[in-house]
Amino acid sequence: MSLTFYWYPKCGTCRKAKKWLEEHGKEINEIHIAEQPPSKEELKALYEKSGLDLKKFFNTSGMKYRELNLKEKLYHMSEDEQLELLASDGMLIKRPLTTDGEKVTVGFKEDQFEENWA
């Protein structure tokens, strides 16, 4: 089973996650999240499969998030507007974003990876 792995190569957390997946023998399809962010439709599908709050998909520690003052603005945006915004700039998306087409993880927590991808 191949995993789709949206990542940013300069991100330390992404590199740790990639190393974990490789050490566990996972075949990964790497996609540079800033150069090829998922489309709005892809994000909607990932969000629905994840069972997470859509706000968990935002990179809240990113410069772009802070520049746009999204902490305040997200509460006033519809789900559709939030998905549109995420699709417009891969740097707004919390990374890495990993999926096998059924399960989805956002970010890298070893216990979540163990539970989903081991």
Swiss-Prot record:
Disulfide bonds join C11-C14. The keyword Ribosomal protein does not apply. This is Uncharacterized protein YusI. CDD domains: ArsC_like. One of its GO terms (molecular function) is oxidoreductase activity. The gene is yusI. Keywords: Disulfide bond, Oxidoreductase, Redox-active center. InterPro entries: Arsenate_reductase-like (IPR006660), Thioredoxin-like_sf (IPR036249), Tscrpt_reg_Spx/MgsR (IPR006504). Belongs to the ArsC family. It comes from the Bacteria. The lineage of its organism: Bacteria, Bacillati, Bacillota, Bacilli, Bacillales.
